Amino acid sequence: MTRISLTRYLVEEQRKHNTIEPELRLLIEVVARACKAISNAVSKGALAGVLGSAGTGNVQGETQQKLDVIANEVLLDANEWGGHLAAMASEEMDSFYEIPNRYPKGEYLLLFDPLDGSSNIDVNVSIGTIFSVLHMHKPGQTVTEHDFMQPGTQQVAAGYAVYGPQTTLVLTVGNGVHMFTLDREAGSFVLTQSDVMIPEDTKEFAINMSNMRHWAPPVRRYIDECLAGDEGPRGKNFNMRWIASMVADVHRILTRGGVFMYPWDKREPEKPGKLRLMYEANPMAFLVEQAGGAATNGQQRILDVEPTKLHQRVSVILGSKNEVERVTRYHQEDAAKA
């Protein structure tokens, strides 16, 4: 059977649907190459001296790991000179990075979390890179933060690479979700699963149970019902999974279903959530919806949230459609009582 490379897939998608512009195809290929380089760095670990803290912090106030910094630099260096981008934004940078004048500029904006789940780096658990692509409002003009302030519905592509037992690139350009596995011998990503679909129902949930006492009542209600199992109102037993790496948890959900929850909690009531809207929640919500799932912040569809700042946070509930709709309904019922 003929193996389909990422490049061939993108070319054939353009022929079939006429939705992938040549510049977007080249941009996705550059991001994929950067993910290969990050995968190589991750796989070397202690051999290359890349484990441990970098001794610095990011704009979120989080301690940066050495691989956080390395992955961020790899993505910047790979993408700044190709002529496809006007600017980039990253979890690891205070502000956006405008393409220098010495390079040609394109009409796309690239946003990324260079290494999601970095608390897992030193313990050798799956981590990943998340990315999102937007169109510039007005190509050719000076980039401002306002150009990035687009709802998730405006994404033209999104994906992630998960660095685990295999390195897998998961991608959508608005025509379903497709998975590509890195063939290290050939040095290329090969299509290994097409048109991924998330089951509408599930018996698995992913949440950090240690935070239960801080959750809002709708989230506690949902989890309490899951924990009650076949003796409770749901009439079935649930399993809990939690990897503390959004990429790994979402990859499991895309593979076999489930619901992922990182909700608001009362420790920081002024913050609507922990995860970042622009380069974590939006790309993952795009992927999940393209795979037949749903993604909400409890009150509204994540892709409809209007961003107001680059590092905006949001509550995230995503995965199997019927479970996400149930949690959303619980939030609506709770709001109606207030």
From Swiss-Prot:
Q: Please name the InterPro entries in this protein's record.
A: FBPase_C_dom, FBPase_class-1, FBPase_N, FBPtase
Cite the cofactor comment.
Binds 2 magnesium ions per subunit.
Q: In which pathway does it act?
A: Carbohydrate biosynthesis; gluconeogenesis
GO biological process assignments: fructose 1,6-bisphosphate metabolic process; fructose 6-phosphate metabolic process; fructose metabolic process; gluconeogenesis; sucrose biosynthetic process
Q: Which reaction does it catalyse?
A: beta-D-fructose 1,6-bisphosphate + H2O = beta-D-fructose 6-phosphate + phosphate
Which residues are recorded as binding Mg(2+) 2? D113, D116, E280
Q: Which cofactor does it need?
A: Mg(2+)
UniProt keywords (A-Z) are: Carbohydrate metabolism, Cytoplasm, Hydrolase, Magnesium, Metal-binding
Entry's Gene Ontology molecular function annotations: fructose 1,6-bisphosphate 1-phosphatase activity; magnesium ion binding
Question: Where does the protein principally reside?
Answer: cytoplasm
Kindly list the places in or outside the cell where this protein is found, as annotated in its UniProt entry: Cytoplasm
Q: What positions does the entry give for Mg(2+) 1 binding?
A: E91, D113, L115
Q: Name one GO cellular component term.
A: cytosol
Q: Where does substrate bind?
A: D116, G117, S118, S119, N208, K274
Record-listed E.C. numbers: 3.1.3.11
Quaternary structure annotation from Swiss-Prot or TrEMBL: Homotetramer.
Q: Which HAMAP family match?
A: FBPase_class1 (MF_01855)
- In its UniProt entry, what is this protein called? Fructose-1,6-bisphosphatase class 1 1
Species this chain originates from: Cupriavidus metallidurans (strain ATCC 43123 / DSM 2839 / NBRC 102507 / CH34)
